[in-house]
């Protein structure tokens, strides 16, 4: 029996955070035995916001090495760089012609990003969701792990797939209509200084973010200065409405140690100050990230291995993507190249 196909991607823009790890990359590793996984470093998406070429080059290799370091196995999963598989851009153009301007103008992420990058509101940023649809539909993905910020884009991909199928092949659909896969994670990873906002690797205030490759001393310092509250006596309780800062730290501690919120509350019942709890949270994060950082350094220094992974992944991805692209091209009437 064939496994359900899953596709997910990670952007090589900025340093990956523990939010990226707990919200996505850790699930990538865990899903490999039960799903046919397609994982990509989405460098085509990254350039919808202006990038320094050298920084993008290094960030792409960094992201690939991190994927490998967290446990993505190229023998179990297809791991590749998006721009190495030209079918993504090719199908993206075709799908543009089956997407309405009004649909794209309603995308909230475009509104948010265009407001933040008002000096460079380019067509690629507007068109981002169509390329994402191509990413998904090329591989016949049954499920796509998405956070709340990407659910609208997945809905658009479903609409495009359904529209194309209804026009050209209602009896034998060319595209699989994907469903969302909502990962069950312990931690809602929020900003360290403002726990009402999601932790973002692109946050200009670096005190809000812990990166996967961050030095232990820096991690401990940031957690020590993280938002808590002024309740007296101090109380460790998981209550997002009234104790967002503490709840955020509890989520991180739970994710790093495997302890439940109930166990954490019992462990720190009757504390006289938040300092010891913060110290334990910081040390738990350092312990969680240490093996990942060590493996990352080993892999990042082995460029021959990384090249081999990229080459094999691109070839495997292209082989599958080419089949879908050929069907779509034939459906619209393109002449097959002799």
Curated annotation (Swiss-Prot):
Q: Which UniProt keywords apply?
A: Aminoacyl-tRNA synthetase, ATP-binding, Cytoplasm, Ligase, Nucleotide-binding, Protein biosynthesis
Provide the catalytic activity annotation.
Answer: tRNA(Trp) + L-tryptophan + ATP = L-tryptophyl-tRNA(Trp) + AMP + diphosphate + H(+)
Q: Where would you say this protein principally sits, based on its record? A: cytoplasm
Biological-process GO terms, alphabetical: tryptophanyl-tRNA aminoacylation
Which terms in the GO cellular component ontology are assigned?
cytosol
Position of sequence motif 'KMSKS' region: 198-202
Cite a single GO MF annotation. Answer: ATP binding
| Alphabetical list of InterPro entries matching this protein | aa-tRNA-synth_Ic, Rossmann-like_a/b/a_fold, Trp-tRNA-ligase, Trp-tRNA-ligase_bac-type, Trp-tRNA_synthetase
Where ATP binds, per the record, is at 11-13, 19-20, 147-149, 189, 198-202
Localization of this protein = Cytoplasm
In its keyword annotation, does this UniProt entry include Aminoacyl-tRNA synthetase? Answer: yes
Q: How does it assemble?
A: Homodimer.
NCBIfam families assigned: trpS
* Protein name stated in the entry: Tryptophan--tRNA ligase
The organism encoding this protein is: Aliivibrio fischeri (strain ATCC 700601 / ES114) (Vibrio fischeri)
